[in-house]
Each structure stands twice: as C-alpha cells, then as structure tokens.
Amino acid sequence: MTAQVVPLQKASSGELPDRVFRSAITACGLSILALLVLIVYELMSRSSLSWHAFGFKFFATSDWDPVNEQFGALPFIYGTLVSSLLALIIAVPLSVGVAVFTTEMCPKALRGPLSFFVELLAAIPSVIYGLWAIFVLVPLLSNYVEPFLKRTLGWTGLFAGPTYGIGMLAAGIILAIMIVPIISSITREVLMVVPQNQREGVLALGATRWEMIRVGVLRNARAGIAGGIILGLGRALGETMAVTMVIGNRPEIAKSLFAPGYTMASVLANEFSEATGDTYLSALIEIGLALFLVTIIVNALAQLLVWTVTRGQPARGHV
C-alpha cells in the first residue's frame, strides 16, 4: 500500500487577511526608507541658508564667530577625524586580540562569559563613560601619562603643551574604549565563519599556532575585520556625550594631542540650544547633515565588507 502524495495548495492571495498582512509588512519596510529620506530632506532644507551664504568654503575655513555670523566647520571636522583615528589606533589591536583569543585560544568554559562581558561594554550609556573619564582617566592622564609623553616625545609636537588631561588624547582614549566591543564582536563573528578545515589544513602543513591564526584565519577574514573596524569608526564619528565631557570644546586646530578640541557631534550638543540667529542655526544643521551623510556612508561600507566574508551565513563555532 503506497501513501498518496497530496500536493500543497497555495493559499489564495486575494483573501482580505492576506492582503492586509502583506500591506502592513510592506508599509513597515518602506517606512524606514521614507524616514531616511525625510531626515535628509529636512536637514538639507534647514541648512540651505548656511549653504547659500558660505558654499563649500564652510568646510574649508576655521572661523566660528556667532556674533559676526562667520562660520566654518574645519575645526570640528579636524577634531572628529583626529579623535576617531586616534581611537582606531588604540582600539583595533586590542579588539582583534580579544576576538582571536575568544575564538582560537580561550577555553570553552570561558568563551561565552568573556564574550558576554565584552559585549556588555557596548550597553553602558555614554554619559557613564564620560563620568568615568572625568574622575579616573583625566587625572591619570594629567598626573602621569601626559607628563611622561611630554618628556619623552614632546619634540614631535604631538605631545607638547600644558598637561591638563582634557583634550584630544582623552577623547581618543574614551572613544577607543567605547568602540572595542563593536570591533571585537564583528571580528569574532567573522573569524567563526572561517571553516574549521582551513585551520586544520594549515596545521597539517606544519604551521605553528600563530602561523595558523595569521595565515589560515586572519588572512581569510581580513575584509570582514576591515568592515568591523569601519563600523567602529562610524560609532566613533557620531559619539557625542562622552567626547563632549572630556575633549575641551574649543574650536581650534592644534597639532598637540594635549590641546582641547571640538567634534561635529559635540558642537551640536553644546551650541544648538544657544543658536539664536537663523544663520547660526543653519550652520549647525549643515554640520549635522554632513555628519549624518558621512555616518551613513561609513556604516554602509562596513556592512558591505562584512557581507563579503559572511555571505549571509550564520557564525559557526568550532572545537
């Protein structure tokens, strides 16, 4: 006696509940795109006064004089780039090291708890990081780290000037601490996607543990690691509260990392409520538009790089 195979029948797409469901889901998806377009439109329309007044010169001059309505965003762009790049210099080696340890060398009993605590750092509010930086990091820098750097490397100009603790160096360090969970988490997921037979094949050729990690794992995951780094950069570019509390908030371009600075996000947080003139307000909104577009581009590039490695595959653990 053979079982009769009954073909599955496709539900009618004309039924009212199905149409309502599909319409609701489609609306949810399109609403995100609509919100993105609406944000860009609103920022562009409200920054048009500044754009017509200063043009591209707005991004190439360092004047910031609300009284005389002369505005230039260069100090804020400089502060954003310097603090973010400094954060990457500090955070990338630490993040990759954490990811390699948790995926390749950490005992299985500790792998889960360690990964949890690393990711827990990303859930801490930025204002808490800022408070910690004010009461712990800044005194440490002003009393010990910056005087040492000034004595040994002051001739470079990067570590010269008064050692107050507040400045670009403090902002870069606190940003580095904040982006470590992002970079390490993405890197760990990418490393776990590398097939186990890739590791075994390299070891079978007589490679050491370090050579296996360097050649068999890191080399195959470098695009995804780069994506995680760029994703961390996107977080650093847009970070506001913690940076505002320790960077000094002075619109200047200084060579020394000890000097106070300003970032694009910080100037928006500090001065938006004080902007009384239309041109002043429009200039701040134009800075916000530039920061928004840069962040979108950076994050999109990061997601693309991560996707080239994972190809949509879920991360796989290995023994």
Whereabouts are the PLM-identified features?
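Transmembrane alpha-helix signature in integral membrane proteins
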Residues: 74-101, 229, 291
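Transmembrane-helix boundary motif in ABC transporter permease subunits
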Residues: 87-118, 302-311
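Interhelical loop and adjacent transmembrane-helix boundary motif
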Residues: 243-292
